[in-house]
Amino acid sequence: MELEESGIREECGVFGCIASGDWPTQLDVPHVITLGLVGLQHRGQESAGIVTSDGSSVPKFRVHKGMGLVNHVFTEDNLKKLYVSNLGIGHTRYATTGKCELENCQPFVVETLHGKIAVAHNGELVNAARLRKKLLRHGIGLSTSSDSEMITQLLAYTPPQEQDDTPDWVARIKNLMKEAPAAYSLVIMHRDVIYAVRDPYGNRPLCIGRLMPVSDINDKEKKSSETEGWVVSSESCSFLSIGARYCHEVKPGEIVEISRHGVRTLDIIPRSNGDPVAFCIFEYVYFARPDSMFEDQMVYTVRYRCGQQLAVEAPVEADLVSTVPESATPAALGYATKCGLPYVEVLCKNRYVGRTFIQPNMRLRQLGVAKKFGVLSDNFKGKRIVLIDDSIVRGNTISPIIKLLKESGAKEVHIRVASPPIKHPCFMGINIPTKEELIANKPEFEYLAEYLGANSVVYLSVEGLVSSVQQEIKFKKQKVKKRDITIQENGNGLEYFEKTGHCTACLTGQYPVDLEW
């Protein structure tokens, strides 16, 4: 998200909650949001923030933000600052080195002519530089280097056609989506509603859940008419711990209004020139938690299929299959099942060391590798290991692991990667470094096995990855359900053919939209 940095990029989690029925509510909104953010902690570990509101005609926004993990930022004393509240939004953030500052923590809050709004954003604007200049030309100051603040200011900026006494927030959101085609998922809070917005390409994930009465949580067959509230989240994995039931994804280009009365679709903004959907395929490969649902399929299942496809494409004579824990475990199980080899653990993980890929400093990454793994040498001494990893970005993690395994008695170590080589940076919200830093673009890639110290290295093909992701997704005509609501019938794509599509730009260099740099 940081405009001046051309290397590592952000990956964040957004969350929102609103109580149903009469207000003031008995629902503990700040705690629900906190638990939701804990469920999204893997999407960002450097800062977190929550903004709550009582939802009155002149609402008071209560804000708390801080650096660090969610549980460190939101102590019981800090949560007291967020009461009394009937709705709120939250954010957990990853940022670049030098930009990990409190001023860049989200959600952002701005005062507008028609009251305050709060915005939390996951993604990165592909035309951020141009939009920044536009705001500055109109005399709108920006206090941070984050394009999330730009989104907030663009929403606050009154469109020329809007009258002072008739704010039209849907028109403002549509204007933003026209100005910025990608990439973002947003939660926007104004007075007594939350808007959930996904860019027309659907590049970043967003879904909606229903807070159930405690007595109904574990009864999936029971169709309770009671609803304690509604939640919106980057991933569905955050729902179980708060007693929410997954409802549906926010569609690409969809603007959803969530109020105490329910959920309704206000509009769907189409993509230009009939472009396909471009959901980030790397969410399946690495970023998402395995129990999350995208496109009506579980991430774990897709990773398992990737492992099976990898076994077809890259078999090898070996004694056992193992994994670099933990995100590659489903792929390793799929590989082992397909080739008929036992799955055996060879590494144990220190769960209190952060993921090396999303720590923004090279030295922190390398130290993380050294502290992150222990070896279970009794399981593999004298044996040939097929070690499955989900991705190799720089090669900083896998090389020390191979050395560690061989020094601990492994006869051979064959690396199989359950995704294709990453060759291009992502400019749409994922932490992928510059082309020069990527191992796939270095001269050493021609002799990668020797360079890493492995006996062999083979990646899953792009075709194999896409096939594994898409094979269970149904291609069919979809009608946007009215979901107990009224949809504005404006001929704007509310009934359309929605074929699946995935962004593979980091693998192929084919970006779904033109980049403005």
Curated annotation (Swiss-Prot):
Pathway where this protein functions: Purine metabolism; IMP biosynthesis via de novo pathway; N(1)-(5-phospho-D-ribosyl)glycinamide from 5-phospho-alpha-D-ribose 1-diphosphate: step 1/2
Glutamine amidotransferase type-2 domain segment(s): 12-261
InterPro entries: GATase_2_dom (IPR017932), Ntn_hydrolases_N (IPR029055), PRibTrfase_dom (IPR000836), PRTase-like (IPR029057), PurF (IPR005854), PurF_N (IPR035584)
Catalytic center residues: 12
UniProt-listed Pfam families: GATase_6
GO molecular function list: 4 iron, 4 sulfur cluster binding; amidophosphoribosyltransferase activity; identical protein binding; metal ion binding
Record field: transmembrane: none
Modified residues (N-acetylmethionine): 1
Origin superkingdom: Eukaryota
Pro-peptide positions on chain: 1-11
Reaction(s) this enzyme catalyzes, per UniProt: 5-phospho-beta-D-ribosylamine + L-glutamate + diphosphate = 5-phospho-alpha-D-ribose 1-diphosphate + L-glutamine + H2O
Cofactor note: Binds 1 Mg(2+) ion per subunit. Binds 1 [4Fe-4S] cluster per subunit.
E.C. numbers: 2.4.2.14
Keywords, in A-Z order: 4Fe-4S, Acetylation, Allosteric enzyme, Glutamine amidotransferase, Glycosyltransferase, Iron, Iron-sulfur, Magnesium, Metal-binding, Purine biosynthesis, Transferase
CC cofactor: Mg(2+); [4Fe-4S] cluster
Tissue: Expressed at a high level in brain, heart, liver and stomach.
SUPFAM superfamilies: N-terminal nucleophile aminohydrolases (Ntn hydrolases), PRTase-like
Sites where the protein binds Mg(2+): 327, 389-390
GO biological process: 'de novo' AMP biosynthetic process; 'de novo' IMP biosynthetic process; 'de novo' XMP biosynthetic process; animal organ regeneration; cellular response to insulin stimulus; cellular response to xenobiotic stimulus; G1/S transition of mitotic cell cycle; glutamine catabolic process
Means of activity regulation: Activated by the substrate 5-phospho-alpha-D-ribosyl-1-pyrophosphate and inhibited by the purine ribonucleotides, the end products of purine biosynthesis.
Keyword S-adenosyl-L-methionine: no
Subunit comment: Homotetramer.
Protein's name in the database: Amidophosphoribosyltransferase
Gene from which the chain derives: Ppat
